[in-house]
Amino acid sequence: MSRLVAELPAQTGTKPERAGRRRRSREERLAYRILVPALGTVFVIVTIPFVLAVWQSITDEDGALVGLRNYTKALGNPLFYDALRATGLYALIVLPSEILLGLAFALLVHRLVKRPALRATLYVLAVLPLVVPPVAVGVVARLIYAPGYGVLNYLLQGAGITHSEILWLGVPILAMGSIASVDIWQWTPFVYLVLFAGLQTVPRESIEAAQVDGATWWTQFRYIELYYLRPLFLLILFFRVADVLRVFDHVFILTGGGPGTSTQLLSLYMYRIEFKFFDGGQAAALAVLVLVAISVLYSLVTRALPLERA
């Protein structure tokens, strides 16, 4: 009998393990219940519209399946490539400008402004352009650049710099620069806020060690601060490229895509296909192609700038 008892497995620890599993199971169920509303919201506002767009892109106006006909029509339209070139030029102007200006301002404030009150004031001022509705921004920009009553021409002529009106919205290259300047004004503060927050995470010990070794400000930025900012550049690039592909409001108000099609960006082109030419299938195909392009671009940028420090 004593031998049989000695050979029985120890029972210690079994009940605590079962209790731990039950506790984890309850926590997992609670987590799932908390996530259900969020997942349901995402499903309603993201998944369902995407599925409907894909369905519309492969059907005609009567709902009959047409395969890839709408995609072929969209890719075969010369105006699509005009819009693609205009969007590419717009991106080449606004993205480098916003990143360089935002980075310069973030470094300037980080190194020269030490008073918390002044930093908070600059933070509030930087947030203001981001909360202004794009339509309001477009209307104000129209008052600045419009011929006849534009404020910019009035100031230039009053200062004697020009003696006749400049058609800021009537010349293709000037019109592109005008709509790009509005985007730069509104979104450079976003870049500044993100990069300034990133600069606050740089270990002070690394900077002090570099200063002791005689490193210049450029060396500190290149080998220390830039290392910590790399994931944030990925974040900025992805969000800004996605926003460039959908920018609409101020371009529609300022130029309407003109002169000609010089400022007709992809979003404005899709709007015209849908609401002017009433070709919902082609517009849906373009929307799906833009979404695929954003996904591919995100994958490429992720490979180039790994998020090991994000």
Which positions does each model-derived feature cover?
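Short, Lys/Arg-rich, polar N-terminal cytosolic tail immediately upstream
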Residues: M1-R26
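A structural signal for multi-pass alpha-helical bundles of membrane permease subunits
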Residues: L30-A310
